[in-house]
């Protein structure tokens, strides 16, 4: 029997995952999480995070934090701020919100100091190994050309998943590796686990689905 897998749903800035619809989807995720054997977390916009973190029992992540502390940083949102509003942690360096190496290290370190979870996104094997060296909780490898494509990385580029897991573990045995890009079905999810990943980071496969509840239920094997 395999151990619990990890499913983190990134709401991005999709209309279907913002405001009232974000809260509705968060409650769907909470309901599905209560009925399956997988860990289900969600990454939501800064504006939705305080409300959703209060309203659901599953873990809620920020999609990004700025690599700054408190001070003269107009328009920035740092790790301390999301902690105060109930976030479990944050994505770091998503392909749509890339950071410099020093900023990734700053965020991972500060999130750890606050007792928050860091999910560092990478795009290939070398960057996965480099990210693992920073000692985040998770590294999520997502080839950018497959993001939102509906073509799962676990099928299109299985060697990227396998080699990323191997490279990360050689650097840091405790880091957990997720894979993303194009994940939409239970078959995609199971394949990712078979390749050595401990779970998936996905977005459009659930958020933009015509029936979000059914899409998530199918992904985690409830259908």
Swiss-Prot record:
Please give the superkingdom of this protein's source: Archaea
A GO MF label: triose-phosphate isomerase activity
Q: Which GO terms describe its biological process?
A: gluconeogenesis; glyceraldehyde-3-phosphate biosynthetic process; glycerol catabolic process; glycolytic process
TM region(s), chain numbering: none
InterPro entries associated with the record:
Aldolase_TIM, TIM_sf, Triosephosphate_isomerase, Triosephosphate_isomerase_arc, Triosephosphate_isomerase_AS
Q: Where is the active site?
A: 94, 142
Stated EC number for the protein is 5.3.1.1
Binding positions for substrate per the UniProt entry? 10-12, 147, 182, 203-204
Which reaction(s) are listed as its catalytic activity?
D-glyceraldehyde 3-phosphate = dihydroxyacetone phosphate
Q: Which UniProt keywords apply?
A: Cytoplasm, Gluconeogenesis, Glycolysis, Isomerase
Q: Which NCBIfam families match?
A: PRK04302.1, tim
Its assembly, as annotated, is:
Homotetramer; dimer of dimers.
- What the protein does? Involved in the gluconeogenesis. Catalyzes stereospecifically the conversion of dihydroxyacetone phosphate (DHAP) to D-glyceraldehyde-3-phosphate (G3P).
| HAMAP family given in the database record | TIM_A
Q: What is this protein called?
A: Triosephosphate isomerase
């Amino acid at each position: 029997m395999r151990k619990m897998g990890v499913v983190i749903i990134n709401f991005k800035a999709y209309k279907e995952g913002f405001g009232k619809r974000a809260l509705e989807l968060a409650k769907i995720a909470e309901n599905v999480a209560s009925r399956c054997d997988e860990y289900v977390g969600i990454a939501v916009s800064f504006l939705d995070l305080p409300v959703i973190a209060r309203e659901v029992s599953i873990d809620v992540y920020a999609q990004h934090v700025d690599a700054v502390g408190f001070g003269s940083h107009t328009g920035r949102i740092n790790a301390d701020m999301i902690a105060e509003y109930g976030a479990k942690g944050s994505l770091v360096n998503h392909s749509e919100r890339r950071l410099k190496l020093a900023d990734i290290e700053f965020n991972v370190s500060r999130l750890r100091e606050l007792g928050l979870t860091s999910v560092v996104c990478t795009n290939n094997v070398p960057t996965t190994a480099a990210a693992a060296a920073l000692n985040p909780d998770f590294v999520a490898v997502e080839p950018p050309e497959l993001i939102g494509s509906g073509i799962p990385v676990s099928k299109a580029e299985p060697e990227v998943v396998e080699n990323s897991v191997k490279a990360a573990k050689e650097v840091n045995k405790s880091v957990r590796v997720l894979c993303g890009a194009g994940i939409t079905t239970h078959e995609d999810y199971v394949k990712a686990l078979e390749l050595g990943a401990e779970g998936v980071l996905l977005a459009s496969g659930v958020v933009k689905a015509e029936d979000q509840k059914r899409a998530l239920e199918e992904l985690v094997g409830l259908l």
